[in-house]
């Protein structure tokens, strides 16, 4: 079957029919990727442009699937930006919050894995999509703005550290998490509570996306109430592998309001659950990979130099409320502390 005929055929499927044939469609696309890999660049570009054109006539959820194929196979930023704009513009009735969140993680992960996919607008689009999703989840939970626990009521010796994934110590982000917790508890004398929100590459509500990637999750950690690291013992909680779960988010907010930590440290960013909790106590986000776009908290610590929109060469974060650019060099901030 020729490519054009194949696209025309699947474009006639409704969503149920598409998912029933999803494995076959993915197999056909994988075979097409192998064929495209043997062609000259000009031929490959022509075929991808044909697919892009035909995708324009498809339902938006199907268009996202086909554009994700074009993005990964072309290895060019143009398709990344078109895909992100398609997700941003998609009506909630066609692509809901959970599906858009899954798309956010899939695209961000692809860009992190292959820097060639990142264009001039990619980071801006990821940030806009994250903010859109954060606002949607806040709306679902009835959260209308920051409502901090009064500073005089907060426990100055208690810090909540949240992250979207906890694996073994050979996993670099987990090691970063434990290193930060060690500094806070052993050297700064804080009581640290670690919460794995399990929001990393959420598969809940995932829609069609080419070569979908999944995050690691260790269910056995749900049975632990503490973690030991270099002689320190940390209180530990892990969310079930069904995030984002609105009931679980409410429970975490209630825990924040009841235990009243002095602040919340979000390791990794791009964690809507952590950012929602950050509406009730000050939140500091420590980025790890592509997560610089994904933070809503009051402050952020970036681990690499970032281009400042004001022209400053230092690292920067932007206050989403005031639009003020707060610039500083944060290369060694956490290590020195």
Spans of model-derived segments:
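N-terminal subdomain of nucleotide-sugar transferases
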Residues: 1-62, 67-70, 90-222
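Structural motif
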Residues: 72, 162-166, 196-199, 240-241, ...
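Active-site-proximal region of nucleotide-activated glycan assembly enzymes
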Residues: 117-125, 280-336
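Short, charged/polar "capping" segments at the starts of alpha-helices
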Residues: 201-209, 273, 293, 308-313
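Conserved nucleotide-sugar phosphate-binding/catalytic loop shared by glycosyltransferases and other
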Residues: 208-245
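Alpha/beta-hydrolase active-site loop
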Residues: 242-256
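A short acidic, amphipathic alpha-helical/loop segment
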Residues: 251-252, 272-279, 297
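Short N-terminal targeting/anchoring amphipathic segment
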Residues: 254-271
């Amino acid at each position: 079957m020729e490519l054009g005929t194949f696209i025309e055929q699947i474009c006639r499927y409704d969503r149920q029919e598409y998912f029933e044939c999803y494995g076959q469609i993915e197999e056909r696309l994988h075979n097409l990727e192998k064929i495209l890999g043997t062609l000259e660049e000009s031929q490959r570009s022509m075929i991808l442009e044909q697919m892009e054109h035909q995708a324009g006539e498809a339902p938006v959820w199907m268009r996202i699937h086909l554009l994700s194929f074009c993005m990964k196979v072309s290895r060019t930023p143009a398709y990344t930006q078109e895909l992100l704009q398609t997700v941003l513009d998609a009506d909630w009735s066609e692509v809901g919050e959970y599906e858009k969140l899954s798309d956010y993680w899939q695209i961000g992960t692809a860009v992190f894995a292959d820097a060639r996919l990142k264009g001039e607008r990619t980071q801006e689009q990821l940030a806009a999509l994250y903010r859109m999703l954060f606002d949607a989840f806040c709306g679902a939970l009835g959260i209308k703005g920051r409502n901090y626990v009064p500073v005089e009521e907060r426990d100055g010796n208690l810090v909540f550290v949240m992250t979207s994934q906890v694996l073994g110590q050979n996993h670099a982000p987990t090691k970063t998490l434990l290193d930060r917790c060690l500094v806070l508890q052993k050297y700064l004398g804080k009581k640290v509570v670690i919460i794995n929100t399990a929001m990393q590459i959420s598969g809940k509500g995932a829609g069609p996306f080419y070569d979908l990637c999944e995050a690691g999750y260790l269910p056995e950690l749900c049975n632990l109430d503490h973690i030991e690291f270099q002689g320190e013992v940390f209180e530990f909680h892990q969310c079930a592998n069904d995030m984002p779960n609105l009931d679980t988010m409410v429970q975490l907010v209630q825990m924040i309001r009841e235990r009243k930590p002095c602040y919340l440290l979000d390791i990794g960013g791009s964690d809507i659950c952590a950012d929602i909790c950050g509406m009730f106590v000050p939140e500091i986000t420590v980025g790890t990979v592509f997560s610089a776009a994904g933070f809503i908290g009051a402050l952020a610590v970036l681990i690499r130099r970032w281009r400042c929109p004001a022209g400053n060469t230092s690292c920067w974060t932007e206050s989403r409320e005031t639009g003020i650019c707060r610039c500083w060099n944060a290369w060694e901030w956490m290590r020195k502390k």
